[in-house]
């Protein structure tokens, strides 16, 4: 490699690192990502838009697609709320709204290729893009092969969706809510936002957060729940469902629907307390360094839940869950 090329690459790398440091400093000072975009301190860069001419602009603020042409949906949103739900219409429809009229480069970009509908926030390299709200509606009888939806700064709600394989959703600073969706596998993750799953039916369910809270009330064969500092609340765990739940400093609250089966429940915390409501006997293995066991326990090794709880300093409290 020529010396001039090497020098140019080093300079480019240093500029990128400097820009990342400036953005990080602003975020630490309490400036939101959306504020950085609006004041021009942050440029939106969506890699695939820069090289793929097949993306089209949502010129009128709304688009519709035949459900026969769409088998998968890939959504990436930056700032603003997202509502993704089933409705009474016969088309897959999307609409975006902003507080002011959008310039061409600020409009949503979409691409439909080989059955995959890809949606992106705007064109590549935009600055001063206003916050935009997105509504995406699919027919009630439409089933996707898979759905992958992510948002950076803004709340996202998914409701009444049917997915053959995996429904994957993620948020950075916004709250995430998934209601009454049916799929084989549901994966939800957030950094500082909360995750709420209500009324969903799936074979396997996985939820992870860093500081956001987790709330789950769903039907599943397997559940994996994990948070660093956020609290976890898992209610009405169905029979035969195996649960693996872990938190570092957050509190775990869990209730089982019944105690007439040999389901496996594992809960692991460091300093967080564990509240457990089992309507009957259980085979409990409680391992702790300095925590206490409180409440009434009916110990049994027969046809009842096998519960393993491990804490460092967190207590285990048996009985009805606190609000």
Segments predicted by a language model, with ranges:
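Short linear S-[DN]-x-LW-Φ motif typified by the pepsin-like aspartic protease active-site region
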Residues: 26-120, 127-146, 150-170, 176-179, ...
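Amphipathic repeat-derived elements
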Residues: 3, 58, 77-81, 245, ...
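Short, surface-exposed interaction patches in beta-rich subdomains
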Residues: 179-181, 186-187, 195-206, 211-323
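N-terminal Sec-pathway targeting helices
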Residues: 1-17
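Generic signature of intrinsically disordered, low-complexity, basic-rich segments
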Residues: 3-4, 20, 184, 243
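Hydrophobic alpha-helical membrane-insertion segments, chiefly the h-region
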Residues: 16-27
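Generic alpha-helix detector with strongest preference for long hydrophobic helices that associate
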Residues: 5, 9, 54-56, 63, ...
């Amino acid at each position: 490699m020529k010396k001039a090329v090497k020098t140019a690459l080093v300079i480019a790398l240093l500029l990128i690192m400097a820009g990342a440091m400036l953005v990080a400093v602003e975020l630490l000072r309490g400036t939101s990502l959306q504020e950085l975009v609006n004041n021009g301190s942050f440029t939106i860069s969506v890699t695939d838009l820069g090289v793929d001419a097949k993306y089209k602009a949502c010129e009128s603020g709304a688009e519709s697609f035949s459900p026969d042409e769409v088998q998968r949906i890939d959504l990436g949103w930056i700032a603003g709320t997202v509502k993704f739900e089933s409705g009474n219409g016969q088309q897959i429809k999307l609409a975006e709204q902003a507080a002011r009229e959008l310039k061409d480069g600020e409009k949503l970009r979409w691409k439909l290729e080989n059955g995959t509908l890809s949606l992106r926030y705007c064109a590549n390299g935009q600055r001063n893009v206003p916050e935009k709200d997105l509504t995406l509606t699919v027919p009630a009888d439409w089933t996707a092969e898979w759905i992958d939806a992510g948002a950076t700064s803004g709340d996202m709600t998914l409701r009444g969706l049917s997915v053959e394989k995996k429904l994957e959703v993620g948020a950075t600073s916004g709250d995430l809510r998934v209601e009454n969706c049916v799929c084989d596998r549901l994966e939800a993750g957030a950094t500082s936002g909360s995750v709420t799953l209500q009324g969903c039916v799936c074979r396997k369910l996985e939820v992870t957060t860093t500081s956001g809270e987790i709330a789950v009330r769903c039907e599943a064969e397997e559940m994996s729940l994990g948070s660093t500092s956020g609290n976890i609340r898992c209610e009405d765990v169905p029979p035969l469902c195996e649960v693996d739940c872990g938190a570092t400093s957050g509190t775990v609250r869990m209730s089982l629907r019944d105690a007439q089966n040999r389901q496996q429940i594992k809960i692991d915390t460091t300093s967080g307390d564990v509240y457990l409501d089992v309507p009957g006997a259980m085979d409990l293995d409680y391992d702790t360094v300095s925590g206490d066991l409180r409440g009434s326990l009916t110990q049994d090794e027969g046809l009842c839940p096998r519960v393993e709880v491990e804490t460092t300093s967190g207590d285990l409290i048996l009985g009805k869950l606190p609000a």
